[in-house]
Design a protein with these regions (language model features):
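Ligand-binding pockets and gating/stacking loops
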Residues: 1-213
Length: 213
């Protein structure tokens, strides 16, 4: 389920159609109960597995309406925690917000969480300036997330994967930029028993092509 999109501000992100008119009112409870009874009776006759999936999706949506609004509300997070994620600085505020949301969803038992950045990394020009700015925006928040997971006893049970769809070429393109390079780039993992300091595979001397594993 998407919470906003990568181009939107984290503070404005919400789940589409999360709230309906009179959410969790007695009237809505009656509607959901009647819908469940009708779907269940139909499933007993047809044994259609797709209908079973529909029933479970409605049940999940109803539970999300009750839980998700609280999860995306950061008002009860302390100033210390916000600062840990870099939310006290303009450069790191947005991605810090995203990483803090990820920790809250992890605490709630969400099994897979994707945290995205805006589409600002495609540096076909001015790579040094652009990547310096972009790296600054994510370094503090992601380190804050890792530290927060550790201090809450969640680090050893949470696999954090930092990756991208491709890297950049080691040769110049345009005005001091770099082209896409899917042939050799880095992904790092942390937590969940991953061995610290271990690297797998290597590239050639220019960092252009993967040559081992």
């Amino acid at each position: 389920t998407a919470l906003g999109h990568s181009a939107s501000k984290a503070e404005d992100a919400t789940i589409d159609y999360l709230q309906s008119d009179g959410a969790y009112s007695a009237h809505q409870h009656r509607q959901l109960k009647m819908l469940h009874e009708m779907n269940t009776r139909h499933f007993e006759k047809s044994q259609d597995p797709q209908l079973d999936g529909v029933i479970r999706s409605y049940e999940l949506a109803a539970r999300m309406q009750g839980v998700a609004p609280e999860l995306i509300d950061l008002s009860n997070e302390s100033e210390r925690t916000r600062n840990l994620y870099g939310m006290d600085r303009k450069e790191t505020l947005d991605f810090g917000h995203r990483c803090l949301l990820a920790r809250r969803f992890c605490e709630a038992g969400v099994r897979y969480i994707q945290v995205s950045t805006p589409y600002v990394w495609d540096q076909h020009n001015n790579l040094v300036k652009g990547h310096t700015r972009n790296a600054l925006s994510v370094d503090k928040p992601i380190s804050g997330l890792l530290e927060d997971l550790k201090q809450r006893g969640m680090f050893d049970d949470t696999l954090v994967v930092w990756g991208t769809e491709f890297g950049r070429t080691p040769v110049v393109q345009g005005k001091n930029g770099r082209d896409h390079n899917p042939a050799g780039f880095t992904v790092w993992l942390s937590g969940a028993g991953v061995r610290a300091g271990f690297s797998y595979g290597s590239t050639d001397e220019f960092g252009y092509f993967a040559q081992d594993n």
